[in-house]
Amino acid sequence: MKNVLLIEDDMLISNLVKFRLKKDGYEVTIVEDGQAGIEAIDTLSPDLIITDVMMPFRNGLEIINHAKMVNPKVPVIVLSSLGEEENTVLEAFTIGASDFIPKPFKPNELSFRVKKWLKYAS
């Protein structure tokens, strides 16, 4: 079973994502801030990471940098509000983000992209 690490401080979004991905057969670990995300990357070795950009303690760009240092091949999907600056999105791709999904998003779209990136990474 593939392990997905979700780093998101909005519990409503976290629960929605977890419900959908568990339905698809994935193991989902949720952490609520960037520092906990860094620690989870080190201890869990996730197959895929989904991260918000704006979070307490560490931001999504720091998450991407750390994830790519630990495992350059791990796919990282960035979830972010439509109001995020374009430069932040471009920087996320520059440092190694695999995909970007604007909030609000459709659970089916997220499910499709997770499946695609896990297949691509294997």
Outline where the language-model segments fall.
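Two-component/phosphorelay signaling modules centered on CheY-like receiver
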Residues: 11-29, 117
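Acidic catalytic/metal-coordinating carboxylates
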Residues: 33-36, 59-62
